[in-house]
Amino acid sequence: MKPAARRKARELAVQAVYSWQMSKNPLDQIELSIVTSNNMQDVDTEYFLELLRAVVRRTAELDAKIKPYLGRLPEELDPVENAILRLATYELVERIDVPYKVVINEAIELAKSFGAEESHKFVNGVLDKAIKTLRKHELS
């Protein structure tokens, strides 16, 4: 699958996770809303669904993995930053086939697109600390 299709999958996944965080609507309802309101032709749909379902299913586990690197309480996170960090944490932990530099770069781009003005700096800082533990095998 082309990198652009993966990027679009991540964009839609962040939007869907954000929607789920804010509304707590059932996952299948959120999936349907995203899929029917977007042109999925240029999206790695399988990757989108994997990211969304895994992040929603494993929220507590992902939050626990990223919490030591936040520098603030998880409940103080901006909901967009939270969605991006959950998604990136899942990729760092489970998608070893995706290089950590790609995960971080994609998360920064998502934060620039959807987050507040300084979100990308915060996301970068958190993930830069997290990779030292979550992807230490790639750093040596």
UniProtKB/Swiss-Prot annotation:
GO biological process terms held by the UniProt record: DNA-templated transcription termination; transcription antitermination
Keyword Lipid metabolism part of the UniProt annotation: no
GO MF term list: RNA binding
Any single GO CC term annotated in Swiss-Prot or TrEMBL for this entry: cytosol
Alphabetized UniProt keyword annotations: RNA-binding, Transcription, Transcription antitermination, Transcription regulation
Keyword flag Transcription: yes
Family: Belongs to the NusB family.
HAMAP family: NusB
Function: Involved in transcription antitermination. Required for transcription of ribosomal RNA (rRNA) genes. Binds specifically to the boxA antiterminator sequence of the ribosomal RNA (rrn) operons.
PANTHER family: ANTITERMINATION NUSB DOMAIN-CONTAINING PROTEIN (PTHR11078:SF3), N UTILIZATION SUBSTANCE PROTEIN B-RELATED (PTHR11078)
Protein name in the entry: Transcription antitermination protein NusB
Organism: Pseudoalteromonas atlantica (strain T6c / ATCC BAA-1087)
Encoding gene per record: nusB
